[in-house]
């Protein structure tokens, strides 16, 4: 592909932006963060529920790669009896698979009640549409009789309660709450502090640009799946100095019409990379649609790719902001290292 202002980012560049995250995951896998003494019971807020823990869970199950990375970055691999929902969606990377070596995947997609009970789990880290469906067989209420307490991903709470726009505060809240639940408060504070510092560095670098209009393309052909105002990419784009053209939709991940994409004329398209359909195939599909030919991002071939675990709430979100900011405003990063 010829050079262009907003190229399809190479894996090499993406990797270069992840050193801190790699060190955090490595520390987690090596067990460098010992659990601090914690006073139990502890009570945390999970969506619209208060959840009390008499002691730290010892047989946890996490669903989805982003939530599993939260456990790893907090040094909690030894508390995992298993994980779910990574292999079936093809969201895992070699780095994550290596970090999870020795921990079984109990279900390739959403786990059943029977799977969680058979694992003798005492804790389920999931979210609405991240391992649970409203009204489904696996919910906090259905797990409780089995002694399984559930913590819900804050971003996903919009499915069960009124929620404001997604923000990094949601991710920080989840990490800090997990720190309290497992008695690793200091480790959680360290992780959150490192994330805040990297976000501040991006903000200093880009200053206050006129926000570019961005459409997030997750998947779909007849109707695209995208991020509304309540989904994490809205916060990622804001932190990177851009604007999600679907931010006014009071929904999380949602389907829209192609007509609405054309009407909002994004200058850049962010492709979420996961599943059997590659990012390159998604880009080619977009370029092949006559109805999108006049959209600025299509006309100028302005695409950015971010992996699934960076687009959904978790420790890789800062890497996504760094990737986005460098691609959107390369001149801000062209000078000497800051």
Positions of PLM-derived features:
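Extracytoplasmic substrate-binding proteins
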Residues: 42-43, 50, 138-220, 301-338
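Alpha-helical, coiled-coil/dimerization segments enriched in small aliphatic residues
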Residues: 89, 226-253
């Amino acid at each position: 592909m010829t050079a262009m202002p907003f190229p399809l980012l190479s894996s090499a560049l993406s990797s270069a932006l992840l050193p801190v995250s790699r060190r955090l995951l490595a520390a987690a896998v090596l067990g460098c963060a010992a659990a601090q003494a914690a006073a139990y019971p502890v009570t945390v807020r999970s969506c619209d529920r208060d959840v009390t823990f008499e002691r730290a869970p010892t047989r946890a199950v996490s669903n989805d790669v982003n939530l599993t990375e939260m456990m790893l970055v907090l040094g909690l691999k030894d508390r995992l009896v298993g994980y779910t929902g990574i292999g079936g969606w093809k969201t895992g990377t070699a780095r994550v698979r290596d970090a999870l070596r020795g921990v079984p995947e109990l279900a390739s997609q959403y786990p059943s009640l029977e799977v969680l009970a058979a694992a003798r789990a005492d804790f389920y880290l999931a979210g609405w549409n991240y391992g649970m469906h409203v009204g489904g067989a696996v919910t906090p209420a259905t797990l409780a009789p089995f002694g399984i307490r559930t913590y819900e991903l804050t971003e996903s709470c919009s499915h069960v309660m009124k929620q404001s726009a997604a923000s990094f505060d949601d991710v920080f809240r989840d990490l800090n709450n997990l720190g309290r639940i497992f008695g690793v408060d200091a480790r959680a504070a360290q992780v959150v502090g490192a994330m805040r510092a990297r976000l501040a560095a991006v903000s200093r670098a880009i200053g206050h640009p006129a926000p570019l209009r961005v459409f997030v393309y997750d998947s779909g052909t007849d109707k695209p799946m995208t991020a509304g105002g309540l989904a994490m990419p809205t916060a990622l784009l804001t932190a990177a100095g851009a604007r999600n053209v679907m931010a006014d939709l009071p929904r999380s991940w949602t389907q829209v019409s192609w007509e609405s994409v054309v009407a909002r004329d994004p200058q850049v398209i962010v492709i979420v990379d996961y599943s059997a359909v590659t990012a390159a195939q998604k880009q080619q599909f977009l370029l092949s649609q006559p109805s999108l030919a006049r959209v600025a991002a299509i006309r100028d071939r302005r695409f950015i790719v971010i992996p699934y675990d960076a687009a959904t709430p978790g420790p890789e979100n800062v890497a996504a902001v760094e990737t986005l900011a460098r691609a959107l405003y390369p001149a801000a990063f062209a000078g000497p290292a800051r």
